Design a protein with these regions (language model features):
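Residue-level recognition of single "structural anchor" positions
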Residues: 1-194
Length: 194
């Protein structure tokens, strides 16, 4: 059977958000030390911003593609990330020196969404681990020769990020490097007989 690459791309755009949703309930817990950063992604020839958070062990917490790089975008990202993680368990958030982060974190503390006890450290070298983690996603984006639409970019990146979480061994009972276990897991969440 031959399948055209554009058909596969349509499947990726259609099913990536569903894969992410179904994988979330099977993720191992992350720790209380977050690394947050954003990286640039071109969509329609314009720069957009992929916000990402991982814990100090390199486990992905969440991601969000936005059109802006500012405090409201950072706040929106944190709110999304807190939806997938208990914000009451966070001890420290490490970021680069982007001025949007302190403002967003301050607003979230004022709204009592983030505890006052959470420490914010704006120290560039503490984020080396997330800068390295960006590489996997950036390689996929470059291989896809950038994106033509924001919605399809967001959905495709969701697939890249979800597969990266599976690859890194973040799924319960599926180890890093266990390709067969990863395949069985994906089949099981979609109800496909192996």
């Amino acid at each position: 059977m031959q399948v055209d690459h554009s058909t596969i791309y349509r499947w990726v755009v259609a099913y990536s958000p569903e894969l992410n949703k179904r994988c979330r309930r099977h993720l191992k817990s992350t720790n209380d030390s977050w690394r947050v950063d954003e990286t640039y992604i071109k969509v329609k020839g314009e720069w957009t911003y992929l916000y990402r958070a991982i814990d100090s062990n390199g486990n992905t917490i969440d991601f969000l593609l936005t059109e802006n790089r500012d405090a409201p975008a950072a706040k929106m990202f944190f709110l999304k990330a807190f939806g997938h993680s208990d914000s009451r368990k966070i001890r420290v958030i490490n970021t680069d020196k982007d001025k949007a982060y302190p403002k967003a974190i301050k607003e979230l503390k004022e709204l009592d969404i983030l505890p006052d006890s959470v420490e914010h450290r704006a120290v560039r070298y503490l984020n080396n681990i997330i800068e390295q983690d960006h590489r996997y996603i950036k390689r996929r984006v470059i291989a896809s020769q950038n994106f033509r639409e924001f919605k399809s970019a967001s959905r495709t990146i969701s697939g890249y990020e979800t597969m990266n979480m599976i690859r890194k061994g973040q799924i319960q009972n599926v180890d890093r490097g266990d390709i067969l276990g990863q395949k069985k897991f994906i089949h099981s969440v979609f109800g496909i007989a192996v």
